[in-house]
């Protein structure tokens, strides 16, 4: 299913030097977001920096949101993850998409202009209303918390 989302280009290098965010394959869930910076940035070990992507989106549909997620290779190979772990883009947000990059490794990491730094995934949203109850229907798990469902 293809959903049309309004995208505003904030950096005129997009479409000329760097492509619009696109899906790499027909099975890709995420669109790559790039570092639209003026020059390379070295992120020191333990440091967090905020990187512009050069775009903003307006989802408009309250049944959709977007999440900014880390790229698996950056995290596994280099210790580069999102400073806020997951970025949530609400359907009514219209500002620039920024990526909080955290270097959790013990070595500096350099982000070059145009590097793919994160991915944007659109997800369905269900807004809930609460029924106030005094007891829940019993389940086999009950109140079992972390690790309660076992290892196997």
UniProtKB/Swiss-Prot annotation:
UniProt similarity note: Belongs to the dUTPase family.
Taxonomic lineage of the native organism: Bacteria, Pseudomonadati, Pseudomonadota, Gammaproteobacteria, Pasteurellales
Catalytic reaction annotation: dUTP + H2O = dUMP + diphosphate + H(+)
Pfam families with a match to the protein in the record: dUTPase
Statement: the UniProt record of this protein carries the keyword Magnesium: yes
Record-level GO BP terms: dUMP biosynthetic process; dUTP catabolic process
Record pathway: Pyrimidine metabolism; dUMP biosynthesis; dUMP from dCTP (dUTP route): step 2/2
NCBIfam families in the cross-refs: dut, PRK00601.1
Superkingdom in the source lineage: Bacteria
InterPro entries: dUTPase, dUTPase-like, dUTPase-like_sf, dUTPase_trimeric
Annotated EC: 3.6.1.23
Keyword Transmembrane helix carried by entry: no
SUPFAM superfamilies: dUTPase-like
Functional description taken from the UniProt entry: This enzyme is involved in nucleotide metabolism: it produces dUMP, the immediate precursor of thymidine nucleotides and it decreases the intracellular concentration of dUTP so that uracil cannot be incorporated into DNA.
Keywords: Hydrolase, Magnesium, Metal-binding, Nucleotide metabolism
Provenance organism: Haemophilus ducreyi (strain 35000HP / ATCC 700724)
Top EC class, one word: hydrolase
Name used for this protein in its record: Deoxyuridine 5'-triphosphate nucleotidohydrolase
Cofactor(s) for this UniProt protein: Mg(2+)
Positions of substrate binding: 71-73, 84, 88-90, 98
Gene Ontology MF: a single term: dUTP diphosphatase activity
């Amino acid at each position: 299913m293809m959903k049309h989302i309004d995208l505003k280009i904030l950096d005129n290098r997009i479409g000329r030097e760097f492509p619009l965010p696109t899906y790499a394959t027909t099975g890709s869930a995420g669109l790559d977001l790039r570092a639209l910076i003026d020059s390379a940035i070295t992120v020191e070990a333990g440091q967090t920096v905020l990187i512009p992507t050069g775009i903003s989106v307006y989802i408009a549909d309250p049944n959709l949101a977007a999440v900014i997620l880390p790229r698996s290779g950056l995290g596994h190979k280099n210790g580069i993850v999102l400073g806020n772990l997951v970025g949530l883009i609400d359907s009514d947000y219209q500002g620039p998409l920024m990526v909080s990059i955290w270097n959790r490794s013990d070595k500096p990491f350099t982000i070059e202009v145009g590097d793919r730094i994160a991915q944007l995934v659109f997800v369905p949203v269900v807004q809930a209303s609460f029924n106030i109850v005094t007891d829940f229907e019993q389940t086999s798990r009950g109140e079992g918390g972390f690790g309660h469902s076992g290892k196997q």
